Amino acid sequence: MTYRVAVLGLGVMGQRMLNHLALHEKFDILGGWDAVPAARDHAKALHPTVDFDTPADALIRSGETDLVYIGVPPMAHAGYALAAIEAGKPVLCEKPLGVDVADSRALTQRMEASGLPQAVNFAYGSSRAGEAIETAYRSGEFGTLVGVDIRQHFAVWPRPWQAQAKWLALRQEGGFVREVLSHFLYLCDRVLGPATLDSFDVRHPADPTLCETHASARLTAAGVPISVASSSGGVGPDLVEITFWGTRKSHRITDWYRTEETEGGPWVETTPVVEDFRRDGAFRQLNQIVAMIEGKPHTLPDFRAALRVQELIEAILA
């Protein structure tokens, strides 16, 4: 059996989703929609057999739709998710769940009350790297986990491949704290459980419409201190890493998927041999989505987990 997906939002994430769905044996693309005609035209050129003319509301209500993927900017997530709930359709939503915390709390309650399969797209919900960290923690491999450090730097924000998504540069719903840090706070939530925000400091440019340039924070989860340092601007390679420090062994993830460990000496790479990490991660996620739709155990974060992350993110940005 294959599952038919309505893809809402045809930007970078929507295009990636289309490409991966097209290659997975358990999914068919029912149709896609974007409010920007140029985005629809671009998608048509890449996937000429797919319907990109049927509006989002009709795709959601269609009796042929088995899953609604929501890849539009964050402030539009709730509207599409609520429409999917009304139509009785399972949902995969991009992160962050939203920007307004009160709205996201109400949405989460509606989603939970519906009993529908639901998930939010955090990178470490199904990736090999996230699984490795959780396994190390559950098995006691760290000894005592004494701290977590999250470090991120972007020479340019938004990143060049995101340049067309102008909203990512704006304070209203963009910024690297929402877009990138949220993945790593989710991983902390997955491994350690809910965190509390102890302190934070965020710097913005002179233009009040633009997103943050620097953000630091301290949090605590399961008694473990978590430190965050994120910034943008300044030449050099981008930095994206999270380190879990233990008394017996420490682990870190760099560049999203590369894993390393140390017992006191130099870092030793433990990254598994995979031909294409992006495709591997996408297929692992799609396999988990199949399990979710079929009511089987899966590792994907639900709206409640995404809400916990959003509450932290918006508190940092407050």
How would you name each of these model-derived features?
Residues 1-47:
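N-terminal Rossmann-like dinucleotide-binding module
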Residues 51-63:
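Short acidic low-complexity segments
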Residues 66-67, 73-74, 78-125:
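Beta-strand-loop-alpha-helix segment that lines the small-molecule cofactor/substrate pocket
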Residues 35, 273-287:
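Active-site loop of classical SDR/Rossmann-like NAD(P)-dependent oxidoreductases
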Residues 42-50, 110-114:
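Short, conserved SAM-binding/catalytic segment
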Residues 124-199, 205-208:
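Predominantly a Rossmann-like dinucleotide-binding segment in NAD(P)-dependent oxidoreductases
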Residues 179-180, 185-257, 286-295:
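Contiguous beta-strand/loop segments that form the cofactor/metal-binding neighborhood of enzyme cores
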Residues 1, 26, 67-69, 288-318:
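C-terminal helix-rich "cap/oligomerization" subdomain common to oxidoreductases
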